[in-house]
Amino acid sequence: MTEQAVRTYVLDTSVLLSDPWACTRFAEHEVVVPLVVISELEAKRHHHELGWFARQALRMFDDMRLEHGRLDQPVPVGTQGGTLHVELNHSDPSVLPAGFRNDSNDARILTVAANLAAEGKHVTLVSKDIPLRVKAGAVGLAADEYHAQDVVVSGWTGMTEMDVAGEDIDTLFADGEIDLAEARDLPCHTGIRLLGGTSHALGRVNAAKKVQLVRGDREVFGLRGRSAEQRVALDLLLDESVGIVSLGGKAGTGKSALALCAGLEAVLERRTQRKVVVFRPLYAVGGQDLGYLPGSESEKMGPWAQAVFDTLEGLASPAVLDEVLSRGMLEVLPLTHIRGRSLHDSFVIVDEAQSLERNVLLTVLSRLGAGSRVVLTHDVAQRDNLRVGRHDGVAAVIEKLKGHPLFAHVTLQRSERSPIAALVTEMLEEISPGALP
């Protein structure tokens, strides 16, 4: 292979925190890790969400050190002739415009990449951090997001339509399920609008690959589905065999209301779980971190927890809410509390899951103990974590789990909020896709 064909990829810390073994995934190319990245990984070793990934990345570097003796010179990685080294030099800031010559870690990473490019190398800065990629573009460096863990997002909504004979719909209503050849290839738990001339029905594919009837009169804690998607979602939430339910959709489509009602139904009425635990990520609109807000932890959590209580106030009476809280049947916690816990006999709701990186989301799912279920609510158009793209995080988890009998996903379509809220949400959706990665 020619020297010109080999590219040089400079990795920042965000890449290694998302995939500790990222250095081994660049085929025959040269991977460069600036020294400041090692320092940033060290600083993240005890982070509540990212600490494990930082330690794994550092352990990988240490294993390479033990094998090769030193890392300041290229050492072989992978099976396709790629190399890796920790860059100690190329720290002359004069290659950058004056405005970028500072002591920030971003500036140090940019300096390494710019110096390597000045030597004639084909350099690409790889980062999951949007601001750093923008800065790289501002100084004329090629930059890209880390794609090795991306999945091809199919746009699967968990719903489909199917034309069938009127007799098939009659059979479905009479027997509660029907074996349809056209439905056997659909992912498990896909909702189906069955159209049979003048008659129609709603069903979903069960684990046996048969279509079972979804009743329109089912309710959870007094809440009934208004749309086909909501009715399928309710049916899935009431099915104890489905351990992970994903509810997507724009703001106001009823994701949180359905999840909370299903949780209260499970705890108070059906008693299949002991308590409802709601985890919310610590990202506000604008990305403000919880630690910068004044007050104790409970006071800091107030605004985050209040969003859950606002939803509950529209669904249950004050007396019911008081009973749930006084008996410890409802907890609203920051996601920092998940690591180290095993959640047994709990109905777990991960709210705003679109702001979670895939590794963090998998950590959450790994905490589930015996008798627990989890509901993920998310809207990928409202990501507050700049390290999460449209093709990773919860979107990647959905694509990986799609079709498994323990997993179901539904994208809710119809807004249940005021006409004003629906209008504004629609406008934001029209504006944002071109601007978002």
UniProtKB/Swiss-Prot annotation:
Induction entry: Part of the phoAT-phoH2 operon.
Cofactors that this protein relies on: Mg(2+)
Source organism superkingdom: Bacteria
Gene3D superfamilies reported in the protein's UniProt record: 5'-nuclease, P-loop containing nucleotide triphosphate hydrolases
Catalyzed reaction equations: n ATP + n H2O + wound RNA = n ADP + n phosphate + unwound RNA; ATP + H2O = ADP + phosphate + H(+); GTP + H2O = GDP + phosphate + H(+)
Entry domain remark: Has an N-terminal PINc domain and a C-terminal PhoH domain, suggesting it has RNase and nucleotide hydrolysis activities.
The protein's role, per its UniProt record: Toxic component of a type II toxin-antitoxin (TA) system. The possible cognate antitoxin is PhoAT; the toxin gene can be expressed in the absence of the antitoxin gene in an endogenous mc(2)155 double deletion. Unwinds and/or cleaves 5'-tailed RNA in vitro that starts with 5'-AC, the reaction requires hydrolyzable ATP; double-stranded (ds)RNA and dsDNA are not unwound or cleaved. Has ATPase and GTPase activities.
Family: In the N-terminal section; belongs to the PINc/VapC protein family.
Protein name: Protein PhoH2
Organism name: Mycolicibacterium smegmatis (strain ATCC 700084 / mc(2)155)
Chain's gene name: phoH2
